Design a protein with these regions (language model features):
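ABC transporter nucleotide-binding domains
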Residues: 9-16, 20, 26-177, 182-183, ...
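Flexible, glycine-rich phosphate/dinucleotide-binding loops
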Residues: 85, 207, 215-216, 284-287
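ABC transporter nucleotide-binding domain
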Residues: 169-252
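Short, charged/small-residue-rich alpha-helical element at the C-terminal edge
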Residues: 220-292
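Generic C-terminal helix-cap and adjacent flexible tail
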Residues: 293-301
Length: 301
């Protein structure tokens, strides 16, 4: 199990993250979504052990970076950037270097090359690679480590639809092997198809956790005009899957059982004057993103 706790994290006087508590069981694919510059990459770097302070804790099966640094680094890998690649080396040399660092057998390198369909160009120098080829190599370097936790920041960047489909297939197979995979991405429809859960980062914290299975469920969004009714509702229906949206009086509820909906609507009928808006339907990552980050854009110049 991976546990991440961040009381606060700042760059100088600028606070970037606070009050973040995440618990992830194996195996799982987690999507991480937020606009640029709001802390996604910082969170990835913290999980990778590249950023730290006294208010940060990352535990993998009760081990941490402070007391088990090398072991954690062998078990958690972050995808490198294309700028980290060496132009004068071949893709195969990159993979062999990573395999040696993680004590991986050469046969597994060949397996990764085959799985990612890179044989045609893997022995060429990286300087000859297209953007998509470089991105696939960066992903292959993660896969070849065979780490338990894989951190991917915009892994689909620069890839055509065929390659997005290929990498998505590999990600699913890695999950089936028992991995935890965390993907920071703007391709929301892709996350809809591969992620078990998607974390939406807003106002320096995880504002909403959306489970993939919720796409098969009805969702009810309620905005309360009365704080007292909001508290009363959350107490009465505390066993339901609820997420706070853009303010403390706005809830997103996922329902599998229509009987749950009946009981909620009965409550709503008795308290209708204290509810300012009500939306019912099926949501996906794209709709949730728009509501979280652009719900107040209407009417602006």
């Amino acid at each position: 199990m991976l546990n991440i706790s961040i009381s606060k994290f700042s760059y100088g006087k600028k606070e970037v993250l606070n009050d973040i508590h995440i618990q992830i069981e194996k195996p799982k694919i987690i999507g991480l979504v937020a606009p640029n510059g709001t802390g996604k990459s910082t969170l990835i770097e913290i999980i990778a052990g590249n950023l730290n302070n006294r208010d940060v804790s990352v535990l993998l099966d009760d081990k941490n970076y402070k007391n088990h640094y090398l072991d954690m680094k062998r078990r958690i890998v972050r995808m490198c950037n294309q700028d980290d690649l060496y132009s004068d080396l071949t893709g195969l040399q990159h993979l062999q270097f990573y395999a040696e660092m993680w004590n991986i057998k050469p046969a597994f390198v060949d397996e990764v090359v085959s799985k990612l369909q890179m044989a045609e160009y893997i022995s060429n120098k990286v300087s000859s690679y297209s953007l998509g080829m470089k991105q696939r190599l960066c992903f292959a370097l993660v896969v070849v480590t065979n780490c338990e936790v894989m951190l991917l920041d915009e892994v689909m960047n620069g890839l055509d639809p065929d390659n997005v489909q290929l990498i998505s297939k590999v990600l699913r197979s890695l999950k089936n092997e028992g991995k935890i995979i965390i993907i920071a991405s703007h391709l929301l429809n892709n996350l809809n198809s591969i992620a078990d859960e998607v974390f939406f980062l807003k106002d320096k914290r995880i504002a909403l956790k959306y489970q993939l299975e919720d796409q098969c469920n009805q969702s009810l969004e309620i905005q309360f005009s009365s704080v007292d009714r909001y508290k009363e509702f959350t107490q009465q229906f505390m066993n339901m899957n609820m997420n706070i949206l853009s303010n403390p009086s706005e809830l997103l509820i996922s329902m599998k059982d229509l009987n749950e909906l009946d009981s909620i609507f009965l409550w709503i009928q008795s308290n209708l004057k204290d509810i300012s808006s009500l939306t019912y339907g099926i949501k996906g990552c794209e709709i949730i993103y728009q509501e979280l980050f652009h719900s107040n854009d209407e009417g602006r110049e």
